[in-house]
């Protein structure tokens, strides 16, 4: 929904105060007009990024669950554990990569710290004075040290974290964020680390490199780290399920777990009806299991499979095929040098392929060499023309599907959405959401960080997209542009803290309240008398 600057300010100040400050513009304005001392005056630009998001989480019960979060093996707490979670949430939300950068970029921000429960005194002196007498050099600003935050957040119970965010995704489903029929896209991405991370996996891969003369060379490269498996909703690009495995583990081991987790989140409010994935992500037994669950799938076939050769032969023969064609205009270049091209796409669909022996239960697969073996039938879509390239009657790329192929273009076009995963989630999470920098170099830290980051990304995405559509009616914009839009709306606002209260004012209003005469006043900002009347204050001469 579209908000005024006053409403945005109200949301930022009121909804993020962790039982520390209370919104009272009139009380704070009175102190300003009387020239009384206040605790601090800060810009509100960073707080604008938070906006209604965390208020909505509070409404659906997520904040209450976070308040009950506990770390494992925590003997005592000088700071409520929820404040550690909120601090780490701010780090994740603002994309701060390194823990050591927190004092300069976050902990020293006196405008944000009161919003998560720390007062200005905590920012300057910390919550604990232990060791202050023996400290050499200046104290690092902030309520706690980055090492303490990392130590506490890693002790977060992974099962509790799963329950918190899984319940939140179900709440979004209940609110109608998803359509009744949801299409899922499954893919995996590497989270590379060094060998110094305890518990990391390792895998050796062959990489082909070319020298300056164009000669190719193959070298073996060992990669350390983990593998993040995702199942996204195709329309919202919201992660429905997340699994973390070691880098050497195959994606197929996690396919059923992803689908089961996503179906659990949507149960009662929506249905996972289709799944698209890359080659090798799902083996034949998993594809058969999806078929028995009533879930349609589209997956590219490997070139060395017998069913791929059978599909090429059927396409070349041209018998019992359904043909789909599409021609669209593609624009190239910019300005005067721009030119357009008509690009044709042609695909053919076929049914009843019988050479996919692994398409069935594990018991069915073991009988593949028996004389009385009967393979389960599967459909296919073969691409003959794509992006202006003619692959001949037999085609090149083959997609296996259990969906109807009377119209072969829809399965082919739907598979194109799979390529959006790297741009809409994996790259977004790795770059602005900082997926690749866990707080510690341990397996537990990596798992907590990945789950925390992707679940927060999922919740924020589910909140952002409906707001954009309602406010602008345009296509959704990326996270970075959306952040810039929020910053633009609140760049001229300041937040004033006075004892246990805070107030949000336009910079021009603040200037007039403290007695500064301004020749240039923005539209909508009257004289000092008008500002005093707005806050129901008597004029003081």
Region annotations inferred by a language model:
Residues 1-56, 530-533:
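Charged, often Cys/His-bearing segments associated with DNA-binding zinc-finger transcription factors
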Residues 4, 12, 296-420, 536-541:
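An anionic, glycine-rich sequence signature occurring as long contiguous blocks
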Residues 40-88:
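Basic, short loop/linker segments at the boundary and entry of helix-turn-helix/winged-helix-like folds
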Residues 68-76, 407-417, 431-448, 467-468:
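Short, solvent-exposed helix-loop connector elements
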Residues 87-88, 102-103, 145, 149, ...:
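Short, conserved catalytic/metal-binding motifs centered on acidic residues
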Residues 141, 146-230:
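Active-site-proximal, Lys/Arg-enriched surface segment
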Residues 209-268, 382-398, 402:
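Electropositive, glycine- and tryptophan-enriched low-complexity nucleic-acid-binding patches
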Residues 434-495:
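Basic, amphipathic alpha-helical segments enriched in Lys/Arg and hydrophobic/aromatic residues
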């Amino acid at each position: 929904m579209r908000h005024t600057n006053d409403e945005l300010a109200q949301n930022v100040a009121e909804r993020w105060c962790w039982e520390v400050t209370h919104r009272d513009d009139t009380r704070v304005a009175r102190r300003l007009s009387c020239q009384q001392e206040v605790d601090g005056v800060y810009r509100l630009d960073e707080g604008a990024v938070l906006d209604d998001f965390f208020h909505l989480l509070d409404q659906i019960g997520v904040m209450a669950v976070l308040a009950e979060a506990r770390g494992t093996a925590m003997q005592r707490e000088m700071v409520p554990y929820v404040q550690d979670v909120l601090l780490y949430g701010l780090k994740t939300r603002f994309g701060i990569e390194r823990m050591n950068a927190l004092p300069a970029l976050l902990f020293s921000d006196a405008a944000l710290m009161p919003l998560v429960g720390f007062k200005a005194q905590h920012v300057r002196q910390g919550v604990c004075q232990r060791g202050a007498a023996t400290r050499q050099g200046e104290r690092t600003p902030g309520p706690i040290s980055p090492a303490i935050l990392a130590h506490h957040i890693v002790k977060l119970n992974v099962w509790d974290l799963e329950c918190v965010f899984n319940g939140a995704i179900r709440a979004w489903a209940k609110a109608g964020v998803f359509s009744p029929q949801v299409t899922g896209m499954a893919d995996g991405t590497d989270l590379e680390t060094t060998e110094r991370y305890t518990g990391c996996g390792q895998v050796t891969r062959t990489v082909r490199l070319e020298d300056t003369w164009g000669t190719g060379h193959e070298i073996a490269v060992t990669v350390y780290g983990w593998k993040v498996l995702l199942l996204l909703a195709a329309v919202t690009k919201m992660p429905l399920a997340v699994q973390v495995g070691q880098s050497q583990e195959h994606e197929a081991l996690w396919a059923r777990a992803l689908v089961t987790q996503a179906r659990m989140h949507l149960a009662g409010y929506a249905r996972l009806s289709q799944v698209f994935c890359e080659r090798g992500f799902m083996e034949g037994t998993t594809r058969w299991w999806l078929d028995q669950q009533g879930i349609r799938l589209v997956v590219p076939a490997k070139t060395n499979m017998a069913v791929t050769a059978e599909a090429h032969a059927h396409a070349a023969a041209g018998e019992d095929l359904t043909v789909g064609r599409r021609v669209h205009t593609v624009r190239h270049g910019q300005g005067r040098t721009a030119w357009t091209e008509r690009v044709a796409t042609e695909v053919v669909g076929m049914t009843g392929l019988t050479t996919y022996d692994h398409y069935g239960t594990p018991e069915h697969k073991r009988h593949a060499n028996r004389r009385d073996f009967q393979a389960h039938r599967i459909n296919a879509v073969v691409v003959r023309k794509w992006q202006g390239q003619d692959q001949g009657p037999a085609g090149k790329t083959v997609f296996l599907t259990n969906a109807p192929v009377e119209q072969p273009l829809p399965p082919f076009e739907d598979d194109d959405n799979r390529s959006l995963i790297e741009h809409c989630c994996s790259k977004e999470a790795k770059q602005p959401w900082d997926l690749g920098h866990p707080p510690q170099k341990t397996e537990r830290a990596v798992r907590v960080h990945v789950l925390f980051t992707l679940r927060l990304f999922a919740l924020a995405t589910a909140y952002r997209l409906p707001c954009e559509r309602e406010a602008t009616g345009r296509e959704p914009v990326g996270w970075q542009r959306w952040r810039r839009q929020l910053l633009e709306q609140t760049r001229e606002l300041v937040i004033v803290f006075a004892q246990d209260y805070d107030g949000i004012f336009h910079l021009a209003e603040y200037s007039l309240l403290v007695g500064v005469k301004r020749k240039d006043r923005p539209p909508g900002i009257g004289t000092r008398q008008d500002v005093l009347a707005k806050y129901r204050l008597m004029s003081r001469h």
